[in-house]
Regions:
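A short glycine-rich, Lys/Arg-flanked "PGG" loop and its adjoining helix->strand segment in the class I
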Residues: 154-169
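Class I SAM-dependent methyltransferase SAM/SAH-binding core
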Residues: 74-129
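A short acidic, Gly/Pro-enriched loop at the edge of an enzyme's catalytic core
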Residues: 128, 132-140
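A short SAM/SAH-binding and catalytic strip from SAM-dependent methyltransferases
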Residues: 139-154
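Acceptor-substrate binding/catalytic loop of class I
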Residues: 174, 178, 205-220
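Short alpha-helix
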Residues: 211-235
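Conserved class I S-adenosyl-L-methionine
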Residues: 2-71, 84-88, 105-108, 112-115, 169-203
Length: 269
């Protein structure tokens, strides 16, 4: 499913179906949504306007400057979130193609685009299936936390490599594997509840979606990028900002970076 959507002023908001019934019994109250940050960020985050935010409570693209000038560039966004990143990029003159497997997130992004009155091409699709994007047609690829919910990351990387121009940049953020070791609801200092080398996934669900977060070590990510012909040129273990904490803030963020940001460049053809 895809559409080319130009926002227009409207008092209407798009409706969305739930993916499934999450109640445990007909007469039971709905269970509380649960899961790691990647279950709700950036989709439920109150993000700064006009700039790409890579994670909660860390500096934005305005400080990191990983993307460069996006004006007149064709940008692929993997994972729509709330549509804030696509809107920010389109507002800076980029021609944005945004992809997400979730119909709900597509509808939320459409509403954000509508309010901002910008133009974004939306596709509902698996992140590893991009038949609607021609080879060597993308100038820049971006993803914020969405790859945490991907099972076969190499497959996604191969697709991104296919559609990027040679030497073009791919910037993405993920949960930092060190932060995943800590109890976010624990004390100060937080307790270690998971091995750094634990490859197990962490299931999550919200009112509209569900999935499994997969934590990957930095070496695993670097190896996956190398074998799909990407060259890593920046790794950022994001330190928290000194501003007022967001609803995503936990004490554990003072002890380990919650967000890992990687910039890689396409090599070869």
């Amino acid at each position: 499913m895809s559409d080319l959507f130009r926002g227009a002023p409207s008092d209407m908001t798009a409706g969305h179906p739930t993916t499934r019934n999450l109640t445990s019994a007909p007469d039971a109250p709905p269970a509380e949504p649960t899961g790691p940050i990647s279950a709700t960020y950036p989709g439920q985050a109150d993000q700064p306007a006009g700039v790409v935010a890579y994670g909660p409570d860390i500096p934005t693209e305005a400080q990191y400057r990983l993307l460069g000038n996006v004006a007149d560039k064709r940008v692929l966004q993997l994972g729509c979130g709330s549509g804030a990143e696509a809107t920010a990029l389109a507002g800076q003159g980029a021609r944005v193609v945004a992809v997400d497997p979730s119909l709900h997130r597509i509808e939320v992004a459409r509403g954000t685009i509508e309010r901002a009155e910008v133009k974004v091409e939306l596709h509902q699709s698996d992140l590893a299936e991009l038949p609607f994007v021609r080879a060597d047609s993308i100038d820049l690829a971006v993803s914020v936390y969405a790859l945490a919910n991907v099972d076969d990351l190499d497959r996604v990387f191969r697709q991104v490599h296919r559609v990027l121009h040679p030497e073009s940049v791919f910037v993405f953020s993920l949960p930092h594997p060190a932060y995943a070791m800590l109890d976010p609801d624990g004390g100060d200092p937080p307790a270690v509840i998971r091995s750094y080398f634990d490859r197990g996934s962490r299931p999550w669900f919200t009112d509209t979606d569900q999935g499994e977060e997969r934590i990957r070590t930095i070496s695993e990510l670097h190896t996956s990028l190398a074998r799909t012909n990407f060259r890593v040129d920046a790794i950022i273990e994001a330190e928290p900002t000194d501003t007022s904490p967001s609803p995503f803030w936990t004490t554990a963020m003072r002890w380990a970076p919650a967000t890992l940001i990687i910039r890689a460049r396409k090599e070869g053809i």
